[in-house]
């Protein structure tokens, strides 16, 4: 190899340049700059220097080396290997090697010692008995060794093996000390194209280890060996004490105490203070039993310190059947506790809720707020179209089927003031959604079409508004149509106790047209006038409080809740508690889709960051910290579960009979997924109402969001119909549905779902059959036939007699036989049918007692199409 610079050599060797310069100077070579050239001779000098330093390090090895080894094994404890218990055993061994030069050669000076006579072999434990007993108390491994001979009689083989092992282990211990030099040497060997022989380590055989057990002890032990003494067993007092503590169970110890040994002060004090005995109670114990809203029978028995069977006996004597894990309500628990002679103490579990109200910061600054107006009315009467004209948007055109199917919240700024509108669905299935809209509003605008009049949902909207004690403003829409009749609308509304101001009532009526914009300004004036009368005010500087209008699961943003703030100000970063869910507000989105930092009273916003989808209608409130929010949310979830369990039907005879009847009916299982919580609730209620005594609809799973693989698996397992309302299935769910031949039904209009499920239920109804008489024949005479038997010669007096149809034989208007018409002939010819006014011969199958004057009634069974 050509001469290289110091820098290049350092790169080849793999060490820093400064370190290589120091090593060159230590080797006696004058190198001060990394650009100086190094020839082959100088490389060899450096290599020899590094080899010498490595050997010096090895020669400076310590006189004593300790090796530690660890082995793992398993032992089955028990009589049977299949039923026994498997125990993991870890054995740790420790070996100490000493240089021969460190051991004083006393064997040559001392007189030879005669080996002691040993009658039986000595079992010697491993050197690390104390370590094993202290660290692995389960089992202790022992080895059997031959009788230990004096050190003077050790043969040369053992000495040679010891020397080899000592050198090997010495080399191992010096690996780290000479690691740097070794790396440099190996790299330099590659550079100068020389090889350094590397000795391979050999594993120590178990036989060698067992022969040198006596050399693993200290110098004192070796001197005792030379005197002919046996190696003692190393059970020190400290290790015995540790082992005794680890193995003790129930006060038992592996090592017995000597008799007469006095007990320690700890045990003496325990014996003096603890006295075992039973004192018979002289009077009945009356306990104060804390009773929450719901409690299980087992927990109630535990609080009274009695067995659950006694509580069940008392409940049965009171006429209520219960099981040990059944949840009973507070009233029943009080009766049972009083019956058993204890004192019930009713506790209110809403302490957490009360504490929440106290923890919420209340503001003091009160300002006027915009009115919250809910637009209600019958479907297709123009609610969304009116709102579109006010907002100058086209929401209705983009809605499926042209109908609203979830609540929309909008904040509108008009020249006359700000107004918050809630647009509710008008379909009959959205009753609960309209009720929520009425509860969260200040004014209700009742839309009635001038050409259609008052409809069922119009009446329902009036009832919701009256229940919420909210003023109503009637807007008579579609006044631009030629057949508009506002007087008819006023007459029909007066029947529902909605009297216009023109007739002496207190309800404002405004004629409008959402299409042309006629009367819209008058309607806005009426809204603002009504809001001034109400004097709407709200606190603006406290913790925000509002109501969840709608909620849904967004694929990219997670749970999204539309919250209408009613008081306070909701800020980004607040901890929001909504029903059973909570979370930190990550973002606030206005009704226009813009990100905002805060929202004041009467402002609807979409909230991102909740843990899950809250229920529409839940109260939303800002809490001081996340710990409080989690505590209240978990409490509400637990209470909801307990109440749900307590509402389970009690085991009664009537309930058993109803359940038996229910098992006979057919069930249509449905897995339902929708885009928002309100639509999900409305569809589920509408489908459940389709159930009858014969067929039932059971929504076994419902959720907000797309159709997933787990939904398809559930539909397969339960043989259910999979319905997606304004949602789609992901790729995995689609592939699984195709493989398992599961059809996924997509809908965007609630009418279509109801119609198709109604059709499916109709097909599940048991068929209904009706018997229709198609012909009557009068027997005039009877003939005998050798093949068939009696043949009735008849005259068809009504309808048509057909062959192979079921018949009845009537005598004096009493049915005497029911069978099948086997043979039908006319003039010795077989015919299929004979009409009224013709004669024929009729042979009745398996019946020969036909007499003149009898009537043969021919009928057929017709299936009647059933409907729900």
Swiss-Prot record:
Residue span of region G5: 513-515
Chain positions recorded as GTP binding sites: 377-384, 423-427, 477-480
Region (G2): 402-406
Region annotated Disordered, chain positions: 201-269
Described purpose of this protein according to its UniProt entry: One of the essential components for the initiation of protein synthesis. Protects formylmethionyl-tRNA from spontaneous hydrolysis and promotes its binding to the 30S ribosomal subunits. Also involved in the hydrolysis of GTP during the formation of the 70S ribosomal complex.
Record-linked NCBIfam families: IF-2 (TIGR00487), small_GTP (TIGR00231)
Listed name of the protein: Translation initiation factor IF-2
Species lineage: Bacteria, Pseudomonadati, Pseudomonadota, Gammaproteobacteria, Legionellales
């Amino acid at each position: 190899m050509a001469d290289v610079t110091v820098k290049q050599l350092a790169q080849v060797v793999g060490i820093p340049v400064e370190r290589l310069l120091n090593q060159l100077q230590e080797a006696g070579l004058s190198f001060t700059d990394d650009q100086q050239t190094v020839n082959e001779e100088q490389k060899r000098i450096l290599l020899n220097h590094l080899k010498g330093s490595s050997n010096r390090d090895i020669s400076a090895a310590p006189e004593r080396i300790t090796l530690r080894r660890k082995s793992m094994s398993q032992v089955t404890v028990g009589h049977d290997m299949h039923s026994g218990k498997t125990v993991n055993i870890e054995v740790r061994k420790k070996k100490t090697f000493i240089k021969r030069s460190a051991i004083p050669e006393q064997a040559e000076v001392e007189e030879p010692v005669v080996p002691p006579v040993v009658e039986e072999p000595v079992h010697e434990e491993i050197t690390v008995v104390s370590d094993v007993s202290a660290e692995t108390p389960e089992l202790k491994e022992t080895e059997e060794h031959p009788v230990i001979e004096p050190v003077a009689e050790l043969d040369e083989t053992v000495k040679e093996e010891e020397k080899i092992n000592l050198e090997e282990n010495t080399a191992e211990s010096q690996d780290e000390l000479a690691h740097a030099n070794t790396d440099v040497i190996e790299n330099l060997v590659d550079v100068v194209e020389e090889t350094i022989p590397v000795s391979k380590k050999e594993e120590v055989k178990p036989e060698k280890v067992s022969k040198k057990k006596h050399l693993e002890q200290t110098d004192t032990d070796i001197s005792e060996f030379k005197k002919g003494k046996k190696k003692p067993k190393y059970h020190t007092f400290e290790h015995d004490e540790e082992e005794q503590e680890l193995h003790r169970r129930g006060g038992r110890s592996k090592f017995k105490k000597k008799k007469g040994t006095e007990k320690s002060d700890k045990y003496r004090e325990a014996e003096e203070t603890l006295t075992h005995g039973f004192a018979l109670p002289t009077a009945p114990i009356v306990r104060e039993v804390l009773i929450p809203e719901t409690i299980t029978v087992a927990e109630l028995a535990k609080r009274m310190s009695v067995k659950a069977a006694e509580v069940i006996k008392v409940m049965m004597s009171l006429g209520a059947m219960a099981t040990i894990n059944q949840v009973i309500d507070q009233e029943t628990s009080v009766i049972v506790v009083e019956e058993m002679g204890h004192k019930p103490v009713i506790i209110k579990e809403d302490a957490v809720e009360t504490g929440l109200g106290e923890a919420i910061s209340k503001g003091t600054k009160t300002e006027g707020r915009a009115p919250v107006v809910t637009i209600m009315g019958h479907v297709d009467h123009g609610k969304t179209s009116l709102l579109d004209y006010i907002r100058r948007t086209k929401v209705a055109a983009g809605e499926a089927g042209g109908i609203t199917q979830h609540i929309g919240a909008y904040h509108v700024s008009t020249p006359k003031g700000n107004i918050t509108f809630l647009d509710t669905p008008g379909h009959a299935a959205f009753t609960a959604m309209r009720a929520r809209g009425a509860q969260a509003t200040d004014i209700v605008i009742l839309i009635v079409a001038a050409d259609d009049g008052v409809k069922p949902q119009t009446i329902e909207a009036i009832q919701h508004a009256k229940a919420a004690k909210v003023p109503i403003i009637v807007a008579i829409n579609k006044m631009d149509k030629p057949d508009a009749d506002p007087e008819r609308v006023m007459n029909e509304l007066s029947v529902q106790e909605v009297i216009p101001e023109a007739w002496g009532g207190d309800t404002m009526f405004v004629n409008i047209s959402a299409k042309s914009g006629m009367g819209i300004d008058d309607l806005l004036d009426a809204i603002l006038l009504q809001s001034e009368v109400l004097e709407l005010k709200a606190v603006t500087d406290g913790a925000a409080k509002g109501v969840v209008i709608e909620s849904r699961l967004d694929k990219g943003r997670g749970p999204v809740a539309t919250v209408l703030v009613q008081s306070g100000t909701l800020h980004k970063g607040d901890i929001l508690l909504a029903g059973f869910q909570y979370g930190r507000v990550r973002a606030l989105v206005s009704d226009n889709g813009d990100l905002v930092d805060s929202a004041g009273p009467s402002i609807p916003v979409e909230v991102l960051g909740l843990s899950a989808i809250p229920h529409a209608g839940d109260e939303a409130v800002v809490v001081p910290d996340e710990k409080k929010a989690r505590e209240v949310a978990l409490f509400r979830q637990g209470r909801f579960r307990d109440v749900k369990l307590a509402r389970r039907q009690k085991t009664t005879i009537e309930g058993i009979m109803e359940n038996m009847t229910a098992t006979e009916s057919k069930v249509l299982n449905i897995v339902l997924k929708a885009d928002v919580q309100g639509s999900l609730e409305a569809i589920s209620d509408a489908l459940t109402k389709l159930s009858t005594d014969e067929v039932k609809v059971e929504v076994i799973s419902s959720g907000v969001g797309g159709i997933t693989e787990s939904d398809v698996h559930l539909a397969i397992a339960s043989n259910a119909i999979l319905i997606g309302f304004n949602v789609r299935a992901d790729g995995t769910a689609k592939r699984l549905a195709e493989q398992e031949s599961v059809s996924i039904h997509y809908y965007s209009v609630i009418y279509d779902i109801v119609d198709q499920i109604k059709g499916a239920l109709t097909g599940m109804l048991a068929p209904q059959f009706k018997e229709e008489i198609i012909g009557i024949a009068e027997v005039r005479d009877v003939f005998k036939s050798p093949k068939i038997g009696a043949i009735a010669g008849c005259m068809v007096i009504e309808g048509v007699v057909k062959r192979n149809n079921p018949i009845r034989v009537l005598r004096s208007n009493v049915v005497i036989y029911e069978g099948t018409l086997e043979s039908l002939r006319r003039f010795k010819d077989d015919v299929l049918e004979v009409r009224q006014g013709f004669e024929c011969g009729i042979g009745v199958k398996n019946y020969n007692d036909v007499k003149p004057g009898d009537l043969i009634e021919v009928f057929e069974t017709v299936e009647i199409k059933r409907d729900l």
